[in-house]
Structures are given as C-alpha cells and as structure tokens.
C-alpha cells in the first residue's frame, strides 16, 4: 500500500475539550484485561476520571457490559474462559453500540491468541484496535511475531502509517500502532477528512512536560486492487524511555483510550488522539518529577526512585493532566 500525505491544516485539537467531557461523563468502563496489569489499568482509569469495573466471569458478561459505557479487551493472559467472556461481552457491546477497544497484546506469540482475535474481528466490529508494530503486522499477515509483547520499532514512519491505514480499512475501525512514536489512522470519506479534522501530529516539548504542537495530516492510499481511500492519519511523539521499564504501560494506555472514547463517541478519532497525547505527556512529566525527587533523596542517602516510583508518578501525572493542573493544547 502506498500512502501520500496530501494536506496540512492549522486546525487544532483542543485537548481540554476531551478532558472536560471525560470529567463530566465519568464513563463506566468494563475491562477484561490481563492479570499482570489489572490493578494499574483500574487505577489509571480512576486517575483520568472514569469508573472501572473488572468483571471476568462469562455468566455475568451480558449484565455487566450492558450497563457500561465502554469495553476494553486485552488478550495478554489468555484462557478459554477469558476468551469466552470477551466474546459474550463484545456481542453485547456491539448490540448496544458500546465502543470496543481491542488490545492485541502478544497476538503473534501463539495460534491460540491469533485464532481468537481473528474470530472476534470476523464476528464483531471493534472501534479501536491497538498494538505495537509487530502485533498489528501479525494480525494483518496472520503470522507470528517472535518478540513476545515487547515493542519493536523496525519500520520507518511511512511504513507504520501505511500499516495503520491498511488495518483501519480492513477492520473498519481506528488503528493505533504504539512505539516511540504512536500512529493512529481512521478510514473516512472525503468530506470528513477535509472538513471535520480535529486531530493529528502532536509532540511533547524538549522538557517532556507535555506541550503539544498540533496540526492535521490527511492521506490518500491505494489498496492492493488499486482503489483509493481517504484517511485521517496522526502521529504522537513524546513520553520517556522509562515507560519501557514498567510492565503494563500499554495496557494502561488501552484503558485510557477506552475511557476517552466512551466519553466522546461523536469524535472517536479525536478522543483516541487525546488519550495517546495524555499518556505521552504523563510519561515525560513522571520522569521529570522523578529526576527532581532523585536529586533530593540522593543527598540524604535514601534509595533513589526507580521503575516502581515511575509507575506511581505516571498514574499521578495522568490524574493531574485530567484534573486540569497542566495546561494542554
């Protein structure tokens, strides 16, 4: 697939608009997430103003999902019972127009995971699929990614955007590819792409404090049959290398995405971009705060903060961003 950037616009995404909607609605999010990070997912959703529920028994899926505003599915610790719960919950969410986020954690590690994801995507239209480059590529090629759930950044920007566009086209949803730079793509008609763009390229400033530079990048891509399609395509940079030293930052991000989308179903692409930007900003803020605290404690012969302290500060940073303590564009 070839992708050509064809337009730039100065129209800006207003981060605070999405944060305000999140605070006002306080969406109830049903998370069927992995057992390694379940507590952190719940806490980061609470930090942003959402209300998490972590039901997992198949017997209560219809009732629980039916009262929720968003469904967050994560295949990180799979089992037959967990996958059955996800199927039931996804069917109910689709029936009631509840947005679904699917996190492809380790999808290429085993045929068990891949078969479930393929069957779910065949049965239910999800609103957002999210994974690192290897995971999204594995789903698109029905293959394996031998790197486990670790992020691999082996493609250049145009390749990553093209992959995101292909996935968005195939599954009729927003595709997020995470990494040092996050990419987000959505299939749209020409009028939407040119008249209603509200998101796109964002980055933190050099200090990592979360100042956003915004603009719009739209693209046209040709598929394998030569047909052309219009896309909204965005890239978000920032964060901090420490985010890779904490397990579950990707799972937390999925919970955050689901919360933002559930709070603004009318602009899901903008909501996804706002969630990605909030997480990148929080990553930089957490590192800055930890470095400052480390200088203080080092002089007193205390243990300097490490990755556990960083995780706590990351959640705190999301709390303060969504509480309006930091001015974001």
Question: Each PLM stretch: what is its role?
Answer:
Residues 113-205, 217-232:
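Conserved phosphate/ATP/ADP-binding segment of small-molecule kinases
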Residues 12-102:
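Conserved N-terminal subdomain of the carbohydrate kinase-like
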Residues 281-329:
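Charged C-terminal helix
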Residues 163-164, 168, 268-283:
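Short, well-structured alpha-helical segments that form the helix of a local strand-helix-strand
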Residues 31, 53-55, 100-104, 128-133, ...:
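General beta-strand structural signal in soluble alpha/beta enzymes
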């Amino acid at each position: 697939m070839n992708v050509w950037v064809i337009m730039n616009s100065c129209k800006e995404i207003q981060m605070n608009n999405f944060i305000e909607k999140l605070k006002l609605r306080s969406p109830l999010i049903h998370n069927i997430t992995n057992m390694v990070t379940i507590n952190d997912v719940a806490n980061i959703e609470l930090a942003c103003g959402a209300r998490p529920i972590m039901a997992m028994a198949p017997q209560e899926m219809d009732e629980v999902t039916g009262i929720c505003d968003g469904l967050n599915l994560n295949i990180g610790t799979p089992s037959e019972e967990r996958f059955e719960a996800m199927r039931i919950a996804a069917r109910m969410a689709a029936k009631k127009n509840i947005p679904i986020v699917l996190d492809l954690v380790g999808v290429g590690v085993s045929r068990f995971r891949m078969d479930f994801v393929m069957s779910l995507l065949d049965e239910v239209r999800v609103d957002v699929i999210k994974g690192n480059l290897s995971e999204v590529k594995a789903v698109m090629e029905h293959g394996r990614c031998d790197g486990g759930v670790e992020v691999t950044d082996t493609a250049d920007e145009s390749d990553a955007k093209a992959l995101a566009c292909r996935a968005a086209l195939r599954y009729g949803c927003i595709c997020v590819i995470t990494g040092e730079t996050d990419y987000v793509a959505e299939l749209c008609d020409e009028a939407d792409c040119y008249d209603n763009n509200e998101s796109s390229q964002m980055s933190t400033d050099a200090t990592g404090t979360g100042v956003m530079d915004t603009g719009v990048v739209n693209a046209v891509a040709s598929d394998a049959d030569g047909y052309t399609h219009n896309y909204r395509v965005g890239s978000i940079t920032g964060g901090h290398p420490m985010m890779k030293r904490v397990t579950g930052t990707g799972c937390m991000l999925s919970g955050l995405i689901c919360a933002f989308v559930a709070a603004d179903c009318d602009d899901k692409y903008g909501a996804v971009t706002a969630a990605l930007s909030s997480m990148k900003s929080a990553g930089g803020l957490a590192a800055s705060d930890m470095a400052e605290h480390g200088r203080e404690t080092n002089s007193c012969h205390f243990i300097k903060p490490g990755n556990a302290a960083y995780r706590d500060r990351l959640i705190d940073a999301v709390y303060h961003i969504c509480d309006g303590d930091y001015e974001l564009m």
